[in-house]
Amino acid sequence: MILFITLPLLNVIISGLLSRYIGVNNIKRLNIINLFIILILLIYYYINIIKTDNEYTLKIIEWINIEYLNINYSFNLDLLSITMLIPIILISLIVNIFAWEYMKDDSHNPRFYTYLALFTLFMIILVLGDNYLILFLGWEYIGIASFLLIGFWYNNIDNIKSSLNALFINKIGDIFFIIALIYLIYIYKSLNYSLIFSLVSYINIDINNIIILCLVIAASAKSAQFGLHNWLIWAMAGPTPVSVLLHAATLVIAGIYLLMRSSPILENCPNILLFNLWLGAITSLISGLIAINSNDIKRIIALSTMSQLGIMFISIGLSSYNLTLYHVLCHSLYKALLFICAGTIIHSLNNELQDIRFMGGLLIYMPITYICMLIGSLSLMGLPSLTGYYSKDIIIESSIGIFTISGLIIYWLVVLSSLLTNIYILKLIYYSFINIPQLNKYIYNSLSLNNTYSLPFNFKFNFDKSWMAIICMIILSIGSLFIGYLLQDIYLGQGNSINGLFIYPNNLNLIETHFAINIYYKWIPIFNIFISILLIIYLYEFNYKLLYIYNNPLFYNFYILFNTRFLFDQILNNYIIRYTLYLSKSLNSLLDKGFLYTLGPNGLNYLLNLLSFNIIKFNTHLFNHYLIYISFSLLLFIYLQFDL
């Protein structure tokens, strides 16, 4: 188990300090080999934990021991943490393979691989930590690593702005996380999971509400929920491997993991569960409305991530943490697949174009990418028998299974969100691969020269040139096809308990979802898929003029509202970030460079000079003055010595 920490740490040290001596390619090989070793060990532990229902604990040192507060630097491996680790390590491995070719022409590869290794290391620490302090340590460092990765190409001002945006919004969540830690220390006198969770039912519900609300806000910032979601959209400024790493299965699920790990506290706070339910539904719907009016290929996929994160919040609000964990695992596979396909397209177009309206006709030149993109998209849509169907549809159905008015409204909101998801992901495929070619003819000539291979008898065929990307896409495509079916009994099977999760028996609604709800509610998400396919074919092939409805003043205003992302960027930049930066500058000038500087360095320097100048005045070179000084000193010594 110690290898889960030491091997990524070795990657960080060697990539950061020794790359100039052993070469960049050797750094890449070492990172891939170490991650592959960790993945093999994880699969071994995963099978063992499923068979025996064991947990593994590793205590390294005693970290803090102050009066009643005792915190160890220790790690715990249970079914919750290992299920989170598998997509983290798998996607990190895929990203390292994909980046080998994608970033081969970049002159700062050692720095890039150092950041990747740093991010992976602290994601592992976050998930394996045995207390909230270690979780917070990993939480902070993945925020720093994501800031460095998003702003990796720092010569572009947009990248710097995007990385700062991500940093500022995540710091809002970090502040609330710190408040929650202070409350936990004050109320529970500990930060250890086992002690807190054993006492939670004896603590006043209002106090628990405050603690878990702070944790929910922290999770909302990290997992891009409505109101704190802006950074996710702008994080696309980084290299595509960074987008895969951050938005598929790592950074954005840190908040989801925090809430799943805190499930014993959440279960004692029904009002916060209801808040999570509505927050997830609104996030899912808002992301769909924004994405359907977006045309950037990476931004559309990022918004689909935001939508799926909203669905995960819904499942948390339903107390269906096993469904949340299952969806995290399944979603990471097809979302990473979509991002890698998008990166392959952008890379093939010489990194010059991300607007899908100016693509088209790529099916002929990139058939493997098209097939893999189609698999990932259909899995995202929830086509029966694919991975996304098994994890996504059961969450949508579970909102009906609680048999409340809120559940019914949430169900229809998520159904509408799913319809929007289906439409914009099909729109992406149509514009990129099927539409009439819109690119410059020289780009198509370049694609034809690079992607055409000859066979005997003058037979030629087109094939994707990027072999590294093809390997990654095939691996993820297999996962997107079969993992959902293969693992459903582990997470959805009756009687299976997941170590690390706690659900009140009254909140178990999976049986009602399976057997009590009307069959029509189960079929509606599937009908959504066929409705969206027919709608896309009708609009883009037979009645394109219908899209001119945007020229209508009413619809145009809605289009502007959705296209400007509900003006959240303007509100955030003009009224929050700008005034926050102004306040920090004022406080820096008033306190740090003003009051404290005057009392500190300047004040101390002035006081010492004044004191030394006055002491010099006693040096009169007169014997009687020296005799008085000696006599006074002797009397003072006698007084202090004998306590007169």
Swiss-Prot record:
EC class name: translocase
Chief place of localization: mitochondrion
One of the record's GO molecular function terms: NADH dehydrogenase (ubiquinone) activity
Keyword field: Electron transport, Membrane, Mitochondrion, Mitochondrion inner membrane, NAD, Respiratory chain, Translocase, Transmembrane, Transmembrane helix, Transport, Ubiquinone
Cellular component per GO, a single term: mitochondrial inner membrane
InterPro entries listed in its UniProt record: NADHpl_OxRdtase_5_subgr (IPR018393), ND/Mrp_TM (IPR001750), NU5C-like (IPR003945), Proton_antipo_N (IPR001516)
Catalytic activity: a ubiquinone + NADH + 5 H(+)(in) = a ubiquinol + NAD(+) + 4 H(+)(out)
Subcellular location: Mitochondrion inner membrane
EC assignment: 7.1.1.2
GO biological process, one term: electron transport coupled proton transport
Topology class, membrane: Multi-pass membrane protein
Residues spanning the membrane: 4-23, 30-49, 78-100, 112-129, 133-155, 167-189, 199-221, 234-256, 271-293, 300-322, 327-349, 361-383, 398-420, 466-488, 517-539, 546-568, 594-616, 623-642
One Pfam family per UniProt: Proton_antipo_M
Function: Core subunit of the mitochondrial membrane respiratory chain NADH dehydrogenase (Complex I) that is believed to belong to the minimal assembly required for catalysis. Complex I functions in the transfer of electrons from NADH to the respiratory chain. The immediate electron acceptor for the enzyme is believed to be ubiquinone.
UniProt cross-references to NCBIfam families, sorted A to Z: NDH_I_L
Family: Belongs to the complex I subunit 5 family.
Protein name: NADH-ubiquinone oxidoreductase chain 5
Organism: Wickerhamomyces canadensis
Gene that this polypeptide is encoded by: ND5
